Amino acid sequence: MQTQPVPEHQGWASRRPTILARRMRAGIAVLLLAVTISGCAPSAVHVSQHDPDNLRPTACEQAWTRARQSERLQKEQADTRAQAWVQAARECPARLDEATVHAAQALAASQGGQASRQTATLRLVQAAQRLDPLAKALPVELADQAITGEDRSGFELSVLAARKTDAAWMLTLADAHTAAAQILVGHAKHDPRQGVYPTTDLLAHPDECTDPANGIQTPTPALIEMDTARTLLAVGKKLNGSSGTIRTDASQNAKSHQQATSALVDMIVAHMSMAMILGYPATSSALLQTPKH
């Protein structure tokens, strides 16, 4: 028996459900893909637009990284290393002590002998001459602390100089302290300077003494410089606000703020480097001790 051919229109009708099902499945897949892509697109754009900002390092982080990298420089590039750490101290007041110690170490390591003492004295004189912006930013209590610290150091150095025959450099150093106190008192509400301070311990140990902060034996002029640096470090720490920056009057602009910060950092580094050049041990553990008096 022969099989009758199926009419063409009947074959199409029998295959239509299968074809329609395939087309429907393909359409649904395309629709789902479009929804998925449209749903994911905003997230991708959000990440690409905002993540770089969230990961961008702060000014402090950038300055600290550059300072750490500068440690690879050679000894003859100590000024560059010191400046990198000075900038880190300006940008990271919460790490003021550590950064200023590194800056002073870099300066002291590159120098030696009488020439370095003259250079360090000049640096201190110049730093003192730039203290006016800091004087404007200091509240009364901290101004008294900074002024008295500088004035006492100037007096003590002048007393030591009077006992020596070749102490012209020490008188110049004493004058720098006195000038710093004078500039700082220029914007103070009162003058806390005593002019004369106790000398019993000083005269008992005019050449070498013990640092009460850590028990280290050091030349007396070096300890005077280190104590002055520590006094200013304490002032700087108390000036640090909750945002990690030096507090200034609301009317002061960004430039005045920057100048006050720079003046404080430069003076601390000048005192520290002078202390090291005069014989204070240049180890970080000794330099970061807090004085007990």
Predicted regions and their residues:
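Bacterial N-terminal signal peptides that target proteins for export
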Residues: V6-I28
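C-terminal motif of bacterial Sec signal peptides marking the signal peptidase cleavage site
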Residues: T36-G39
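All-alpha RGS (Regulator of G-protein Signaling) helical domain and cognate RGS-like helical scaffolds
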Residues: A41-H293
